[in-house]
């Protein structure tokens, strides 16, 4: 299997994101490797050796997606027996010309703990954990968004992803079996109606998920799952709560759609 490397003298997050995005366009399997914090000559040489071995083992040149601030270490990597893609180089010179200023590359600047976005994200993660699954309903005034939906529709992972990636304070509240007889917005959520965002899911997918968690129970029964999905979607429509179906979406896609629908400010950068 052909190898793909994502490497950097920083976190390698940028290389991973761009590299995976490009490779996802092709119906081919790859053996993925991430090497971060290549900050010394020794580490660069070790990475080069690893890449060359992967090329030799796979029979085809490894693909290397990289971002380097240090020119010497970049040159070592670029001498590998591999096909290389430098994500920064094509854009730096045109930007320098447009901005009329020379770039001053600094490692870790994008993902530094000294950035304000880091503080936003840590605070948002703490908020998401404290306000997960309706465990705390007393401080929704701090929420940027409140995700609602039936159990196992994707509320918790979406809340945490919004917090960790974008610094958005996302609470979430579940509609349970006890709510279904006369489903309505709870009194403590009514003052925050504009913050509500609904998640729904196809009944069959919900059955499959719940069956893996609590097989042969009322909770995972087809009748229960279909009823809950039907009632919660009726509530969304009656109360004009925006909502999306999460059945075929990854957590990245779910949160991207939430951000698009709500227009929430991102604190990532």
From Swiss-Prot:
Keywords: Kinase, Nucleotide-binding, Serine/threonine-protein kinase, Transferase. It comes from the Bacteria. InterPro entries: Kinase-pyrophosphorylase, PSRP. GO terms for molecular function: ADP binding; ATP binding; phosphotransferase activity, phosphate group as acceptor; protein serine/threonine kinase activity. It is an enzyme of class 2 (transferase). Its EC number is 2.7.11.33, 2.7.4.28. Pfam families: Kinase-PPPase (PF03618). It catalyses: [pyruvate, water dikinase] + ADP = [pyruvate, water dikinase]-phosphate + AMP + H(+); [pyruvate, water dikinase]-phosphate + phosphate + H(+) = [pyruvate, water dikinase] + diphosphate. ADP binds at residues 149-156. NCBIfam families: PRK05339.1 (NF003742). Belongs to the pyruvate, phosphate/water dikinase regulatory protein family. PSRP subfamily. Bifunctional serine/threonine kinase and phosphorylase involved in the regulation of the phosphoenolpyruvate synthase (PEPS) by catalyzing its phosphorylation/dephosphorylation. This is Putative phosphoenolpyruvate synthase regulatory protein.
């Amino acid at each position: 299997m052909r190898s793909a490397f994502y490497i950097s003298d920083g976190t390698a997050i940028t290389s991973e994101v761009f590299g995976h995005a490009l490779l996802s366009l092709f119906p081919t399997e790859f053996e993925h490797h991430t090497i971060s914090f290549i900050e010394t000559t020794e580490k660069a040489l070790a990475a080069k050796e690893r890449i060359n071995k992967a090329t030799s083992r796979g029979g085809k040149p490894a693909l290397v997606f990289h971002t380097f601030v240090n020119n010497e270490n970049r040159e070592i990597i670029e001498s590998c027996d591999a096909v290389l893609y430098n994500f920064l180089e094509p854009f730096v010179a045109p930007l320098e010309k447009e901005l009329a200023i020379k770039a001053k590359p600094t490692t870790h600047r994008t993902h530094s703990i000294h950035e304000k976005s880091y503080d936003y994200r840590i605070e948002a993660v703490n908020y998401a954990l404290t306000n997960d699954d309706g465990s705390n309903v007393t401080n929704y005034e701090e929420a940027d968004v409140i995700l609602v939906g039936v159990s196992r529709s994707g509320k918790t992972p979406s809340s945490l992803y919004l917090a960790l990636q974008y610094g958005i304070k996302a609470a979430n509240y579940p509609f349970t079996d006890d709510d279904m007889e006369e489903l309505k917005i709870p009194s403590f959520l009514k003052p925050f109606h504009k913050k509500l965002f609904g998640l729904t899911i196809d009944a069959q997918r919900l059955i499959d998920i719940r069956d893996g968690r609590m097989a042969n129970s009322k909770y995972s029964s087809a009748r229960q799952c279909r009823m809950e999905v039907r009632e919660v979607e009726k509530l969304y429509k009656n109360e004009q709560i925006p909502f999306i179906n999460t059945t075929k979406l990854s957590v990245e896609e779910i949160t991207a759609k939430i951000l698009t629908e709500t227009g929430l400010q991102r604190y990532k950068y």
